[in-house]
């Protein structure tokens, strides 16, 4: 909190070997009670809202009850905001890059989590390429959307968020301005 952060996100979704060796990332989904303890310790020590980003499964443990149990354990520990990357993380056999493309997207899991835990907020992540897609997810009951690579490759798309998602008047901005504003965050 002393550094001006609004929240802390515990990422339980990264499948890289380097991250696994440190017992971080997606492999943590195999230990939901440990993640719940970490969540509570982080929230208590920081005093900040703490969120969890996770996949829908790990390796061949990717049926809905697996992710439902993971989220349920965290929900019981007090977590109320989940960012759901709607792909399974394969810890062996796929590179991090392949893990972003090869496992199929299962957005129905995010919708079902929202139904099962209606008091929690669920943001969907994974394979979202346009603001129009984002709006569809929100219009259909999810609380938010996390856009990754699409925003990285086309940062100027973010200039239309208020227009597309919230119906505000279009705000014209040149790509050069977007890059200049984004550069301030890269240093």
Regions found by a protein language model. Give the residues of each.
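Alpha/beta catalytic cores of nucleotide-metabolism and tRNA/nucleoside-modifying enzymes
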Residues: 37-40, 45-47, 58-60, 64-72, ...
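Glycine- and other small-residue-rich loops at beta-strand/loop junctions that grip anionic moieties
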Residues: 27, 31, 99-102, 125-127, ...
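Alpha/beta enzyme core
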Residues: 1-24, 32-120
